Amino acid sequence: MDFSPSATSRIWLQKAQTFFERYVLPHNAAWHQSVADGVYPPPFLADLKALAQDEGLWNLCLPTLPLGAPGTCLSNLQYAPIAELLGRLPWASEVFNCQAPDSGNMELLLRYADAWQSARWLAPLLNGQIRSAFAMSEPDIASSDPANLQTSLRRDGDTLVLQGRKWFITGAAHPDCRLLIVMCRDLDGVGQIDADGHRQHSLVLVPMDAPGVQVLRNIPMLHHLAPEGHCEILLHDVRLGPQALLGQAGAAFAMAQARLGPGRLHHGMRSIGQCELALRLACARVRERQAFGHHVSAFSNVQDWIAQSRVAIDQARLLLLQTAWRLDQADSDPHQLRSDVAAVKVVAAQLQTQVVDRAIQMFGAMGLSPDTPLAYFWSWGRAMHLMDGPDEVHLRSIARHSLRQSADQGASLAAYFTTPEQLQSPPRIR
């Protein structure tokens, strides 16, 4: 494994950094003011997106693209440091058409959409003309086990009929959101025969303006109301043509992995960027502030916090780069890769809450205010412990993989023991 940036990676990172510092970062205060005034998206965002596309800084997060589609086809490893850069501003990714959940939805459509679906949905997403959302979690069941999902899909002749309720659907309140990808229980598709519940669900492409689709509310998270939305949505007798079914009936869980793996990696790298910024802000703060006749940076507990954060960020970055590298390898063990992606999800959430919490403590009361990005970083980090599945589900997946590996290695591990029986039976060399 070699994580050192390639020449291509360095070129694109430099271009992205120059654009970010010249055009995006100077608009940060204006973005917040616009959102506070109820104007979303801010009027300058379209100009920034057009400029980024003109400079080729577009769809940076997609390793594969259709012929003629705008983008760079950077590998996951090449995109990782760019994602870290963009993570410093939560809204920056949209400038480059790399924002969640659209990036994951585009990955899904790239793999499974037919020609009609690609023209209808994928092309405008790739061009940044529309936004989308992915509807999985539900309010009345434990969504951490996706086999519990109850939103139903039935067939009335050639018509697909959806009924149910989803919530915490990111992006659904965006004015440009046109597509809702819904995971639903297929009541009469081929998936109904599966006993363990993992081939009973299908994915359906639902236009946001379809009759029966109703956004009930935008749910605040820790008193933060995201302008793009984390919405509760009612699907009441939504009727669609057969072309709305994405991929095979009953294959929703397997298909969803196409978006969750890279998506979790992108979330993780953006977390690294936010943690780096939090640490830099905290270091600058304690160097300039004095208490009890000394700079705050001179206190040993503050130095411990800084050192712990530095070590944790570097450790997490190495894990994420390793996972990005493995995602790029065609021959990677899928079980190991699934465990790595789960580890990324857990580590990124833990890192962000711990590093940002220390930074807030070093800032003092100002760290709790909207005057710095720290309060938002902390609330987003806390949400990461639950989004895309709670930490405990991912830890369970990691443990199961480790236990399977241990079972396969049982015989070879016996030689490491020195029990009385083994001491009495030395091996023969000849």
Regions found by a protein language model. Name each.
Residues 1-90, 99, 112-117, 124, ...:
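Alpha-helical interface subdomain recognition
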Residues 74, 144-147, 172-177, 194-199, ...:
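Short glycine/proline-enriched turns and hinge-like loops at secondary-structure junctions
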Residues 94-116, 145:
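N-terminal glycine-rich flavin-associated loop
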Residues 128-137, 182:
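A short, Trp-centered hydrophobic/proline-enriched beta-strand micro-motif
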Residues 137-142, 168-170, 219-223:
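Short, solvent-exposed loop/turn elements at beta->coil junctions and helix N-caps
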Residues 148, 210-239:
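Flexible, small-/acidic-enriched active-site or ligand-binding loops
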Residues 159, 163-215:
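A short core secondary-structure module
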Residues 237-254:
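Long, acidic (Asp/Glu-rich), low-complexity accessory segments flanking structured domains
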